[in-house]
Design a protein with these regions (language model features):
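Metal-dependent nucleotidyltransferase catalytic core
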Residues: 1-38, 44-90
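Short hydrophobic/aromatic-rich motifs at helix boundaries and adjacent loops
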Residues: 2-3, 23-25, 45, 101-107, ...
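Conserved nucleotidyltransferase catalytic core and NTase-mimicking acidic/glycine-rich helix/loop elements
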Residues: 113-223
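A short alpha-helix capping/helix-coil boundary motif
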Residues: 11-12, 30, 111-113, 152
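Generic alpha-helix signal with a bias toward terminal, lower-confidence helices
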Residues: 27, 33, 38, 42, ...
């Protein structure tokens, strides 16, 4: 990650040269320590306009999001995923406005409850997936089963986050936070992602039934 840190230093020197860039924040995998050589740099800058720029800096792709305070505040209230922009960020410079947004994000995250309609939509999708998986297993169609697993794993993860009353994070962060989910299926991550086709299918079916019907032996911690 040394290349990323050198590129970050180059970028922040340029951004800090302008007083208009009042807050500068590092987001993404570099911020929460899960970056690899192919990871981008993702920065948020609070200023007086909304814009975006992307460039390669010392061989590292960098994306910089420029936003007004009001734009970010509105997004926090309209897009639950936006809270993660603040929960796992690293502040480089702040005039106080970013701190206000971060505090609001923490409050929204702690009070978040998945809307009933959202849960119903997820379960409608997953119930259909369950029937398709069962049909593929009955006919021993491994190719069809594997296809269903690959195209529906993300929806299962959405369901697990929703059942735990957490906004669904961006995909890279979602993987990083899987251990924070209360899921009463032993070694479910390994079985769902690394098992044989049969093991993956069995695990997905168990998770779907847990998500959509919350079977009596399963409970979710509240709070």
């Amino acid at each position: 990650m040394q290349k990323h840190l050198r590129a970050l230093e180059t970028i922040t020197e340029r951004l800090q040269a302008s007083a208009q860039n009042r807050s500068i924040v590092l987001n993404g995998s570099v911020a929460y320590g899960n970056a690899d050589d192919a990871s981008d740099l993702d920065l948020l800058v609070l200023c007086d306009w909304d814009g975006f720029e992307s460039s390669s800096v010392e061989g590292i792709m960098a994306e910089i999001h420029f936003h007004r305070f009001d734009t970010l505040l509105a997004r926090l209230h309209s897009k639950p995923m936006e809270v993660y922009r603040y929960l796992y960020a690293k502040v480089i410079r702040d005039d106080g406005n970013y701190a206000v947004l971060a505090q609001r994000a923490r409050e929204l995250y702690q009070s978040y409850r998945t809307p009933v309609q959202s849960m119903e939509k997820i379960c409608y999708w997953l119930s259909s997936t369950e029937q398709k998986l069962l049909a593929a297993l009955r006919t021993q169609n491994d190719l069809r089963t594997a296809y269903l697993l690959s195209t529906n794993t993300w929806k299962v993860l959405e369901g697990l986050y929703a059942l735990n009353h957490k906004p669904v994070p961006p995909s890279s962060l979602a993987f990083h936070l899987l251990d924070t989910l209360d899921v009463p299926v032993e070694q479910w991550q390994q079985k769902l992602l690394l098992g044989t086709v049969e093991t993956k299918a069995e695990t997905m079916l168990r998770l779907i039934r847990f998500i959509c019907r919350t079977e009596p032996e399963y409970t979710i911690r509240q709070g």
